[in-house]
Regions:
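Detector for the mature cores of small, proteolytically processed
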Residues: 1-122
Length: 122
């Protein structure tokens, strides 16, 4: 998606979603033995990022891929704010509490498989 049109159209039909999913699953990355097709994202993670809209005036969120301590692929979310001079969405971070008294990212996702819906049409 081009940043000039960001965010653009955010809803797609199930048929389009199925086609995109099929393309991914047929790609070299999607065919890999340890391929992750989706992520289960707890509402708590999404709500934490959405709260950044008020506190940090974010325009968007960015998801980074990583591997956690359990060896699972995961997504880590950060807020992003558009730099009007450059047009680039820059990551912004909120300070954590207690043990996380530093810039924080939001996690909690689980890879699919194994945490997927076996009956999904996507």
């Amino acid at each position: 998606m081009s940043e000039e049109k960001f965010p653009g159209k955010i809803e797609i039909s199930l048929a389009v979603g199925q086609e995109w999913s099929k393309k991914y699953k047929e790609s070299p990355e999607g065919r890999a033995k340890d391929s992750v097709n989706a992520y289960l994202v707890p509402l708590e993670s999404l709500e934490a990022v959405l709260k950044l809209k008020e506190s940090l005036k974010i325009d968007a969120a960015r998801a980074y891929k990583g591997i956690n301590e359990q060896g699972e692929q995961t997504l880590m979310f950060v807020g992003a704010k558009k730099n009007e001079k450059t047009g680039i969405y820059e990551d912004v971070f909120l300070e954590g509490d207690g043990d996380l008294a530093t810039a924080v990212l939001y996690d909690g996702t689980r890879p699919c498989p194994p945490f997927g819906d076996p009956t999904t049409p996507v």
